[in-house]
A protein has these predicted regions:
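Short, acidic, metal-binding catalytic loop of nucleotide-sugar glycosyltransferases
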Residues: 21-31
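A conserved acidic beta->alpha catalytic loop
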Residues: 22, 38-47, 63
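Short beta-strand/loop segment that forms part of the nucleotide-sugar
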Residues: 31-40, 59-61
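Glycine-rich, basic loop-to-helix element that forms the pyrophosphate-binding segment
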Residues: 60-78, 88, 99
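Short aromatic/hydrophobic "clamp" motif used to bind/position activated sugar donors
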Residues: 83
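Conserved donor NDP-sugar-binding/catalytic core segment of glycosyltransferases
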Residues: 91-141
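Short, flexible, basic/aromatic active-site loop/helix in glycosyltransferases
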Residues: 115, 133-165
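A short, conserved alpha-helix in the catalytic core of glycosyltransferases
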Residues: 160-216
């Protein structure tokens, strides 16, 4: 398998119904699988997936392990060259995978990348979670292209260049599975939030590169 798109879910039945159709529709390829890793949901998520999305692979976890360990456990059951850690509230667009696949295929020194992320409600603006790639200032504060503190910019093509970044957002993290495993995966001590920054930091410490691919 070339790519596994893995969505972590916890009691998000309605959210999956809303956003999963775009992922399935825009990820049709014999070399791409779409997986939902269910983090011990108590709602009807698993039953709904089985009935309404038979093409989606379901990975059932025994309880809510949080974001980091939930993904670590799920990715133990995945075998693909690349994996995409995709939030359950992300709507993807046509051909979203191809630019990232092509770039990683051509640049073996790059461990991970992210697409441009725009707001789902105001599509002309960047999304707070990741925008156009993440950095860390000299005081250790994380920020993004397209976002300063709580203010997001309008996307006017100002960040349409492929650029090395310090960290890629966990909302849509495209990563080589080998790099993920060699770096030790996400740190479970980060139950939720900041875990992707820590992972990217460790990848960079190993001499690997992180890139934003705004064509995706």
């Amino acid at each position: 398998m070339k790519v596994s798109v893995v969505i972590l879910n916890w009691n998000g039945c309605d959210m999956l119904r809303t956003f999963l159709p775009s992922v399935v529709r825009c990820s049709k390829s014999g070399q791409v699988e779409v997986c939902v890793a269910d983090n011990g949901s108590t709602d009807a998520s698993v039953e709904m997936l089985r009935e309404e999305f038979p093409c989606v692979r379901i990975i059932v976890l025994d309880q809510n392990h949080g974001f980091a360990d939930g993904y670590n456990l799920a990715l133990q059951q995945v075998e693909a060259e690349y994996v995409v850690l995709l939030n359950s509230d992300v709507e993807v667009t046509e051909h979203w995978l191809e630019p990232m696949i092509s770039y990683l295929d051509a640049h073996p020194e790059v461990a991970a990348c992210q697409p441009k992320i725009r707001s789902q409600r105001q599509k002309e603006y960047f999304e707070y979670a990741g925008a156009a790639g993440g950095f860390i200032d000299k005081y250790g504060y994380p920020f993004c292209r397209g976002r300063v503190m709580e203010v997001v910019e309008k996307d006017e093509g100002q960040y349409d260049t492929i650029l090395p970044v310090f960290w890629a957002t966990g909302a849509a993290l495209f990563i080589r599975l080998a790099d993920y495993r060699e770096a030790g995966g996400l740190d479970g001590r980060f139950f939720a939030h900041m875990e992707e920054i820590d992972l990217c930091w460790r990848l960079r410490s190993r001499g690997r590169k992180i890139v934003c691919i705004p064509q995706s």
